[in-house]
């Protein structure tokens, strides 16, 4: 493998045995591609905004005299960039402008004569834009739109599995689900009649819908039944014989023909009998007259003489009727063929319970069911039925729905109309009856072929269409009302409904979620999440076990591991690593094609439906050097089952071993050795890891770390190759390679880094350069690390030296004992940034004022504020300190005599305002790192606001000037080259000022042209600089757009540094979580023979019962990696020759059985080897991919190489006594995470606080400054102890005895420590509750 200069700095040793056939796809593509589809112009009009516009336009007036047509649309430029939107708290969006054409037709003239055409561009609201990382900035906060897994449109056949009816009879049903429009259900009842429901309303006999489609009884029976024909010849009854229909029946009479008895009465008719009848070509047999009684006629029979109806279709025949028919000359009688086995008489029975007889009565019946209580008219009934399933405005199956519908009914074509046809409805009924008759299977609704993904773009398009339809109504009104000659398209369109629909979706839809920004992994997983909840999806309460369960079709599409614990389990899933959606929105996963036992590199993406037809081998099947299967029998999956197949039967093979799992689970090393429940916790807890102060790459990883760090967008990645020209903490400048430059540009790329900003979860986002001046860079190299990344690899935690042993009960029940060294070295210190805002409003009594002049506040409290009343940057503050001084006008209240006196002495001021300053919340302390002031337009800016503005302007000017200088330098270097090539001496040039160079003329015409081009570029650069500076200045100095009634907002950012402490929650990557019980002095920790103490002591009992053995293997491998690092460190300290160093490191990389990673250090220069060694001396990072990891034997080899016992266990000594522990202890390096469940955020104590209104008991919870509930069981405990007085206090004065607690407070102040308990308020509530039930209850006095 070829490594770039940056990648050579640290190479992960990979234990993977299988070569990577397919690179890991870009992990955010599901979001970005979907949104791109939504906003890009689509000439076909299949999806996105274009499709929405085409579906609603043209809008015609009711009279048809005019119409509004759609021409095209364009998205403007956003006003603010992403960062500015976040700071100002606005939405990152672009204005949508649509070109519309108003066409007015002549009234009297023949149809289609145009009188006037007006075209105009109309503003249609703002469309939120997606940032390059797949998020949206809505009102200043980053949000993610989660993809939804919903039931695909189409037709589904299902059964109730015998649960509905007490008899346990299985009732079948069919459901036609459109993309939008009414649902149509067909279902059997326990009596085997077929019913229909529209939109899950009251059920009607299914034949009603056929009558509404204008079918007569005769036609209905004709559609669903085969006929049995009887003929009356010579007063005998002959039946036309179809031998196959007799199979399985018992003969009720002798079946004879041509004088030969084929089957005797009472005998079961078998296949042999049928073969005989067919062989002798028997066409008809004589049947006794009684046999026809009870059969059902297939059509109406009318007396030809009188015209009287003898027998209507679907009537049962009796002997009398037969005689009547015979008399009136009907010698040929058609009846329905039914039997109990596989030709049920369901439709015939249903026609009998159907109250309607013709189309009109059927339509009226449907109207009554849909609109109960409204009087039906013929027109209304017809319109309603027509609009239900046959109108393109109201009903749409969509391309997906039509494809699924036609596939289900086994039709050849997969395209067709979006509305239903008669045939569609009849074929669905036929298939349902077929399933009831035992032909065909019901669908599995949890199969991923029946569930599809709805991503951002599609949901946004649907919302946009909803807005457009609202506008359509208004436009129709306007077109009918107004004077069209003076109206323009702009007057027709009101953009409000559209913006409202879009805003509602992005702001408050259930699937638009506040982004989980704890660390890069949590961001990426949130964007790849797939939810079955949300509008049009399931609800938690109704989702049963089956929907939540892992389905065989999840393989390679949805992760079987990563899902939340709790009520949402299985409803919220994560996309597998290689999965993507196809054009219809179904999930598909890649496979390698296998031909005649040879595995090729051709890759096909298969959806769940397609996959069912193939035999697919696993990724870990053994192949020889040619790529053929080694074994004759290969373990494969086929039709959802796993079994052995011969190698010639195999069609496909998995692409990779980590194809099954999601990104989160693919980061767990030795996942294959963990129990699934613990792996689930491990995958979920990695998302809660807080970025530490200094990120530390995992010694034992899986090789996915780099992909996650780069794709998450938290790192700065080189857009083009080049050389680092400038680097500091906040910007990196690259001189681009000649071959990657565009014609006529300066060839300089500038990357501005994010410094100490707040994330959604209040963690700290900070980027730090990881490249140096002069280094060569290739496209895609990581230039700067973000939070939780280390040299471009994801680094969520720290490598800790752990020992598995008990230690004085401090690791009982998963507690964790931590060494003080971890705190001293700041290994788990994290920075949390809080944003506190102070809003100054315009009140009825006058405006609130931000000022340092606050009544009744001492000098000390104001010491950290400047003269504008805003805290200084850099001030250290603690709970209760004032951050922004603010006073609110106070209404004139009745003054107390004391106040009157004060007022008389000191004058007005003190009393007419009250202090409403912004203070630091209780329990928080930290450093102020930033302050921002937003002032409404037209409100005078205070001194601090002007200072901040001045600073921002300076910074902007400095940034742009530096940018200009860098670009100029690059340009002048090229001008210099052209001049020297054109014959100007370099020495003379150096004496001439740079800006005079462009005045020189060259004799060489080509060079002169080049020089002129460069001169143009120089002028362009300068004018560009001026424009940018001007725009920046305008943005910074303009007033802010604040909410109504708000004059000023001051935002203060407070950084809190949190060290690890007892009560914090920590975890490994294998679901091994625990709480820190004690921080132990270094000298008390167990140490090894070299005197190295361990960092963390874990309980060995946490492993066996939980079956997450991966942690032990990780510990051993981590120890080996550290040992090798130690050896490299020794060699560096002894200044050994580079050749020896190279040989040792090469040996480490080559170790392992048929490992597929090849690192050839002979291609590295000595400097590169030394730099690699420097980065490896703290431990050699190792990758052990999921399901393809290091074997036990390889771990032992590595341990040996690092000079560590192959048992992985060493002798430890007690730090307190120095005595050796009895047994050897497993010691090694485990990657530990600090989770965002910090004790500082949970610790809470209440003094006097707020009380609940009804019960007068203290509120609960930290946010309400609430108390601890002393519940029923706690009361029992006090009763059991007989602690009567304590109990009385708890139930009265400490809770809801209002007078008692006030008096108690007063007593304590007076130094009188007695209490007089009274009546608890909740007792009164109980009395009132009982009285409300109509029972009078009174308390009797003593």
UniProtKB/Swiss-Prot annotation:
Which EC numbers does the record give? 2.7.7.6
Reactions the enzyme catalyzes? RNA(n) + a ribonucleoside 5'-triphosphate = RNA(n+1) + diphosphate
Per the UniProt record, one Pfam family is RNA_pol_Rpb2_45
Q: Which superkingdom heads the taxonomic lineage of this protein's source?
A: Bacteria
Please list the GO terms describing molecular function.
DNA binding; DNA-directed RNA polymerase activity; ribonucleoside binding
The terms describing its cellular component in GO are: DNA-directed RNA polymerase complex
Instruction: Tell me the CDD domains matching this sequence.
Output: RNA_pol_B_RPB2
Q: Which SUPFAM superfamilies match?
A: beta and beta-prime subunits of DNA dependent RNA-polymerase
State the Gene Ontology BP annotations. Answer: DNA-templated transcription
Keyword field: DNA-directed RNA polymerase, Nucleotidyltransferase, Transcription, Transferase
Q: What class of enzyme is it?
A: transferase
Q: What does this protein do?
A: DNA-dependent RNA polymerase catalyzes the transcription of DNA into RNA using the four ribonucleoside triphosphates as substrates.
Q: Which NCBIfam families match?
A: PRK00405.1, rpoB
Q: Which PANTHER family match?
A: DNA-DIRECTED RNA POLYMERASE I SUBUNIT 2 (PTHR20856)
Q: How does it assemble?
A: The RNAP catalytic core consists of 2 alpha, 1 beta, 1 beta' and 1 omega subunit. When a sigma factor is associated with the core the holoenzyme is formed, which can initiate transcription.
> What family does the database annotate?
Belongs to the RNA polymerase beta chain family.
Q: What is this protein called?
A: DNA-directed RNA polymerase subunit beta
